[in-house]
Structures are given as structure tokens and as C-alpha cells.
């Protein structure tokens, strides 16, 4: 007798695996994954944007059960409080959240966001999503696991040749996506010298990289404070 789950909102800085989480959920549940780019729904003609939203809803419900992945929902509604678009953003927002709150079809919504300040309070309010998860930067244990994943992908069976414990210590504040780029850059260093890349190449790559957490430290701090002050679940088990 339980109603169908509405969905989840995944909030975190870029590169923490929000998009990957959406794809993994769809794979685990063996359901089709529909990706919605809200930016493409907005049109210049009055009323056309709302019509596109309703069309999107019709398609999702016709394909249900399915997963609707709303990527970077914060950017879509960043202008909801302004009057520069003649209220189009507000009307699109109203259409979407009304459907989200009242829908009875088995469409599971996974929305991702980088900047919580851009998300209207109506979207986060109880009853819209079943849960709001905060995806923090990976811990040392998680960074070690991420290095293992990428090293085993690029050098199957040889990941133990690298000092992964040391690498996880040196890559503090790196996101999962940034760790992947560290590995790719180290591979380039080895390729340029016609040899296999080593732990030393990975260390050099780490030292040359400036993680987003450093360049946007204020935004990250605000995001952490928001996560700690509200009814938000942490996605990490550590």
C-alpha cells in the first residue's frame, strides 16, 4: 500500500559522483534512465517553456517505470527569484514541483545540484523528494578506493604496483573526478618518455593539480554548513 517513491536530491561540489550515482541506480534497478537538461526547456515564446515541461512529464510517465535524472537543477532555477524572464522560470518551477509533489506514476526523480543557494526553497521542502543527500569530498579511505578503481581500469592487475596509501594521503581535498585526472596526467608523463607511469608520476601530477576545493573554499564551507544544519543525509558511510 506504500506510494511510489518520489526521488532524491543529490547535492555536492563538482566531481563527487552525483552523475555516476544516477547511472548506477538505473543500472542496479534495471530501469531506463532519462536525462533532463532543464536549460533546453526554456524557449523565447511565452508559454512554450511550460508546454515543454508538460511534454517532458508525459514522456517520462509513458516510459515508466523509469528514472528521470534532472542534471544540475540548481542552474535551471538560478533565476527563479528575478524578474528578467517575465516569470517564465517561476512558472516552469511551479509546473515541475507540483508534478513532483502530486505524481502517482512510478517515475523516480534523481536531481543533482552543485550550489544549494540557487535552489528555490520550494524544491527542497518536505514532500518533494524522499531524501536529500550531501556528497562530501572523499575521505582518505574513499580516495584510496578511487585510486584503486582507476588504476585497475587503466592497468588491470597492476594496481598493487603503486603506493596507493601514500597517494590517498597526498590527494587530500581532491574529488573523485580530480583523482581520475591525476591518473590520466601521470599516464601522459610516462607516455611522453616512452615508459610506464609510476607512483612518482602520480605524485607529480597531484602536486601540479589545484583541486576545486581550494579555489572555491568559501562555497564548499557554506555547503558543509548547510548540510550540517539541516535534515540532510550524508552519502558517505565514513
Over which residues does each language-model region extend?
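A short, flexible helix-to-loop-to-beta junction within the catalytic ATP-binding CA
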Residues: 80-81, 190, 194
Amino acid at each position: 500500500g506504500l506510494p511510489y517513491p518520489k526521488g532524491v536530491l543529490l547535492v555536492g561540489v563538482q566531481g563527487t559522483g552525483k552523475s555516476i550515482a544516477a547511472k548506477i541506480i538505473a543500472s542496479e534497478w534495471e530501469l531506463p534512465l532519462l536525462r533532463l537538461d532543464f536549460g533546453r526547456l526554456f524557449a523565447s515564446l511565452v508559454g512554450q517553456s511550460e508546454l515543454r515541461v508538460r511534454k517532458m512529464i508525459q514522456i517520462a510517465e509513458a516510459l515508466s517505470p523509469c528514472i528521470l535524472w534532472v542534471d544540475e537543477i540548481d542552474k535551471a532555477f538560478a533565476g527563479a527569484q528575478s524578474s528578467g524572464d517575465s516569470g517564465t522560470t517561476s512558472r516552469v518551477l511551479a509546473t515541475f514541483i507540483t508534478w513532483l509533489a502530486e505524481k502517482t506514476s512510478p517515475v523516480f526523480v534523481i536531481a543533482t545540484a552543485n550550489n544549494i543557494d540557487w535552489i528555490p526553497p520550494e524544491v527542497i521542502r518536505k514532500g518533494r523528494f524522499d531524501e536529500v543527500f550531501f556528497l562530501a569530498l572523499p575521505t582518505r579511505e574513499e580516495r584510496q578506493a578511487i585510486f584503486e578503481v582507476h588504476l585497475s581500469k587503466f592497468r588491470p592487475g597492476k594496481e598493487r604496483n603503486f603506493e596507493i596509501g601514500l597517494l590517498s594521503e597526498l590527494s587530500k581535498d581532491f574529488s573523485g573526478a580530480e583523482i581520475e585526472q591525476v591518473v590520466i596526467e601521470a599516464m601522459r608523463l610516462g607516455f611522453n618518455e616512452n615508459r610506464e607511469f609510476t607512483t612518482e608520476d602520480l605524485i607529480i601530477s597531484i602536486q601540479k593539480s589545484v583541486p576545486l576545493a581550494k579555489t572555491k573554499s568559501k562555497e564548499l564551507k557554506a555547503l558543509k554548513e548547510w548540510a550540517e544544519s539541516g535534515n540532510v543525509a550524508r552519502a558517505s558511510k565514513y
